[in-house]
Amino acid sequence: MASKRILKELKDLQKDPPTSCSAGPVAEDMFHWQATIMGPSESPYAGGVFLVTIHFPPDYPFKPPKVAFRTKVFHPNINSNGSICLDILKEQWSPALTISKVLLSICSLLTDPNPDDPLVPEIAHMYKTDKNKYESTARSWTQKYAMG
């Protein structure tokens, strides 16, 4: 069941890739993918290329995939291990969602952080109290870790 669904999503992604994202299996393992997300142009992550790993559980799509950043990101909803605080990867997951929709949600999270549900409270605090400092720090991390 899971592998059939994953194959279908892969075909759909190749046919109609979401803007500024790409994803596909690592080697021969259909349950382990790597994705690339381009930093959205209207965000401090612009110009960055962010690598993301995707692990599908055996009972996918009834359980959400495990998605994590491999590239370091300065963001209130992404911690230093690359974990992402995104409702659709947890309690709001639905089998109707696809990897394509997950990647687009991560892109919009980069543009619009959710400081009220932070994974990194210090960054959320900075975002709320000193947005310029947040944006310049996020930009410098992007240049340091996500470019070249």
UniProtKB/Swiss-Prot annotation:
What does the record give as its pathway?
Protein modification; protein ubiquitination
| Alphabetical UniProt keywords | ATP-binding, Nucleotide-binding, Transferase, Ubl conjugation pathway
Any idea which residues are catalytic in this one?
Answer: C85 (glycyl thioester intermediate)
For this chain's UniProt record, which GO biological process terms are given?
protein ubiquitination; ubiquitin-dependent protein catabolic process
Enumerate the GO terms in the molecular function aspect: ATP binding; ubiquitin conjugating enzyme activity; ubiquitin protein ligase binding; ubiquitin-protein transferase activity
Catalytic activity from the UniProt record: S-ubiquitinyl-[E1 ubiquitin-activating enzyme]-L-cysteine + [E2 ubiquitin-conjugating enzyme]-L-cysteine = [E1 ubiquitin-activating enzyme]-L-cysteine + S-ubiquitinyl-[E2 ubiquitin-conjugating enzyme]-L-cysteine
**Source organism's superkingdom?**
Eukaryota
- Its EC number is 2.3.2.23
Please describe the organ and tissue distribution of this protein's expression.
Ubiquitously expressed with the highest levels in rosette leaves, roots and petals.
Query: Domain UBC core spans what residues?
Result: 1-147
Read off the Pfam families from this record. UQ_con
Root EC class: transferase
Per UniProt, subunit arrangement is: Interacts with CHIP and the E3 ubiquitin ligase BB. Associates with the E3 ubiquitin ligase JMJ24.
Q: Name the family.
A: Belongs to the ubiquitin-conjugating enzyme family.
Q: What does this protein do?
A: Accepts the ubiquitin from the E1 complex and catalyzes its covalent attachment to other proteins. Mediates the selective degradation of short-lived and abnormal proteins.
Q: What is this protein called?
A: Ubiquitin-conjugating enzyme E2 10
Q: Which organism is it from?
A: Arabidopsis thaliana (Mouse-ear cress)
Gene field: UBC10
